Amino acid sequence: MDNIAILEALLYTSGDEGLEQKQIIDILDINLNQLEDLVSKYHSHGLTIQRYGSTYVLTTKKETSTYIEQLVKEKSKMKLSQAAMETLSIIAYNQPLTRGDIEMIRGINSDGAVKTLIARGLVEAKDVDHSRSHHLITTDLFLNVFGIENLDALPTTEEDEAEMDEFFSNLVNQKGESNE
C-alpha cells in the first residue's frame, strides 16, 4: 500500500482532531518534505488534506461547501453563548492572556466562558515561566473550526469591513441558546 493511501486512512481514523505532523512523519517513516509532497499530491473526489497549524486533517474540498452547509445548517455542532464567543474573540486576537486580562477587557467575570472554551478544545491554558497564572491561547482545533491555517489569517482592522463583519457573523452563528 502506498503512503498516500496510508495517510488517508490515518487521517480518516483520527477524525476532526487530525494528526500532528510529527506523528505522521514517525508512523510513515518519512521526512517533512516527503509529507508535504504527499499532501500536495493527494486527490480524492470530495476530500483534501488541510493543514491547520502543525495538524493535518482530512477534510472536504471547498467546492463541496454549499452542499455541506445545507446538511450542517440544521445541526450546529459547536454552539457557544455570546459570552463565550466574545471571550474567544478576545483570546484569538490578544493571546496569550490570563483570565484576569480577559475580565479587564470584558469588564465582567469570564470564568464560565473560559471553562466552556477549554472544554470544547478551542482554548488551552499554558504555564508560563515566572508566572503563577495560566495563559490562555487558541488551539489547532480553533483554526480548524474557523477554517484558517494560522492566526495571521484572522481579519485585521486594515481589512475590508465586510470581511470583518462576515468573520464575526460566522462566530455569532455558532452561538447557542444556553448561557455558557
Curated annotation (Swiss-Prot):
Keyword Lyase: no
UniProt key word Oxidoreductase: no
Gene3D superfamilies, per the entry: Winged helix-like DNA-binding domain superfamily/Winged helix DNA-binding domain (1.10.10.10)
Compartments (UniProt record): Cytoplasm
Record keywords: Cell cycle, Cell division, Chromosome partition, Cytoplasm
Example of a GO biological process term: chromosome separation
One GO cellular component term noted in the UniProt record for this chain: cytoplasm
Domain of life: Bacteria
A Pfam match: SMC_ScpB
SUPFAM superfamilies the record matches: Winged helix' DNA-binding domain
UniProt xrefs under NCBIfam families: SMC-Scp complex subunit ScpB
Subunit record text: Homodimer. Homodimerization may be required to stabilize the binding of ScpA to the Smc head domains. Component of a cohesin-like complex composed of ScpA, ScpB and the Smc homodimer, in which ScpA and ScpB bind to the head domain of Smc. The presence of the three proteins is required for the association of the complex with DNA.
Family membership: Belongs to the ScpB family.
Purpose: Participates in chromosomal partition during cell division. May act via the formation of a condensin-like complex containing Smc and ScpA that pull DNA away from mid-cell into both cell halves.
Name of the protein described by the UniProt record: Segregation and condensation protein B
Native species: Staphylococcus epidermidis (strain ATCC 35984 / DSM 28319 / BCRC 17069 / CCUG 31568 / BM 3577 / RP62A)
Phylogenetic placement of the source organism: Bacteria, Bacillati, Bacillota, Bacilli, Bacillales
Name of the encoding gene: scpB
